[in-house]
């Protein structure tokens, strides 16, 4: 998967996922005989993406489709090479639960697989070497030894701890345009607690994706 563009990958323990996920949202809900969940992560957009305006960044700033392509190919490869039934885990929302409830938590898969840890920046997973990544998962009946979650959380970074000690805020808190982030750091410089106002974030970050609302504003 690295040759195809993945930066990191790991195997999540299916039984751990079943214990943590809400009822009906563990891997076995999608594939009853699943033995392993493979999680992989790809990097974000190019450096130039961050020099573009907000409207442009809304369309080119993420690379999750590359992660999905790699995962789809991996599922086919496992079936061809090992003869074990596999599926690309759909990243879509549950049509019976509305627009905010996914069929599976790709974030949880990655966290349990040890390729990301939750941060103060809106609970985004961070990797100590690759930072923020986009994730995809493969469910397979091939039994693989599971990896473990990260022992050390890369968040907060020492420089963030220093700023928090001086101002009471980490950089992500300070520069969030809608003040949707809050939290605290303990005496050892470790993440103590965090709060993320998802509604405030969505109102700002998805304004260029919510086409109906844009049209409504135009008609007003």
Enumerate the predicted regions with their spans.
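Non-catalytic, usually N-terminal nucleic-acid engagement modules in DNA/RNA processing proteins
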Residues: 1-65
């Amino acid at each position: 998967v690295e040759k195809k563009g993945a930066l990191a990958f790991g195997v999540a323990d299916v039984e751990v996922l079943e214990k943590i996920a809400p009822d009906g949202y563990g891997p076995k809900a999608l594939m009853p005989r699943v033995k392993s969940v493979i999680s992989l992560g790809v990097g974000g957009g190019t450096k130039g993406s961050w020099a573009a305006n907000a409207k442009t960044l809304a369309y080119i700033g993420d690379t999750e489709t590359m992660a999905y392509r790699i995962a789809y190919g991996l599922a086919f490869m496992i079936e061809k090479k090992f003869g074990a039934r596999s599926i690309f885990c759909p990243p879509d929302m549950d049509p019976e639960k509305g627009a905010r409830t996914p069929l599976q938590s790709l974030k949880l898969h990655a966290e349990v697989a040890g390729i990301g840890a939750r941060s103060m920046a809106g609970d985004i997973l961070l990797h100590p070497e690759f930072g923020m990544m986009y994730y995809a998962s493969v469910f397979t009946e091939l039994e693989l030894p599971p990896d473990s979650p990260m022992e050390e959380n890369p968040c907060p970074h020492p420089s963030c701890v220093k700023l928090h000690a001086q101002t009471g805020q980490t950089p992500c808190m300070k520069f969030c345009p809608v003040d949707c982030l809050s939290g605290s750091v303990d005496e050892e410089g470790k993440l103590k607690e965090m709060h993320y106002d998802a509604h405030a974030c969505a109102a700002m970050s998805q304004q260029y994706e919510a086409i109906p609302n844009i049209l409504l504003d135009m008609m007003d």
